[in-house]
């Protein structure tokens, strides 16, 4: 007979933490090239989502309408497997504390993902400036 906990559709807290630790461990070993590419696209997607949310809010005359659009940027980043430095700020220290990564790998990841995010958002900002 199976237990009722195994029939539920939710993830237990300890399973969630284990998944986060595993994700942090995997992220700490990604190559610099992939960190920059994923970080760039992540920053660009978030920048485009911000531009779209602001445009919809202003053009519609209902600023709150943009708040429904912006989360699609975050969802896209997750679904496409991109790297956003704020998420890595949470996942990688957990992997270090669990012994799945090192602080040097964590700082390396943060640095390259931040650079990629910055370049992606700067790219969208330049395109927006050219468009104006």
Tell me what each language-model feature is:
Residues 52-62:
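Short, hydrophobic transmembrane alpha-helix segments
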Residues 18-36, 100-104:
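Cytosolic juxtamembrane amphipathic/interface segments immediately preceding
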Residues 60-76:
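Loop-to-helix transition at the N-terminal end of transmembrane alpha-helices
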């Amino acid at each position: 007979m199976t237990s009722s906990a195994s029939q539920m559709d939710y993830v237990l807290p300890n399973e969630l933490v284990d998944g986060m630790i595993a994700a942090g461990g995997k992220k700490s070993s990604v190559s610099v090239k992939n960190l920059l590419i994923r970080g760039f696209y992540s920053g660009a997607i978030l920048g485009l989502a911000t531009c779209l949310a602001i445009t919809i809010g202003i053009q519609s005359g209902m600023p709150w309408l943009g708040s429904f659009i912006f989360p699609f940027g975050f969802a896209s980043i997750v679904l496409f497997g991109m790297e956003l430095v704020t998420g890595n700020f949470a996942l990688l220290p957990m992997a270090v504390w669990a012994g799945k990564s090192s602080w040097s790998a964590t700082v390396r990841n943060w640095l390259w993902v931040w650079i990629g995010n910055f370049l992606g958002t700067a790219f969208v900002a330049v395109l927006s400036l050219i468009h104006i």
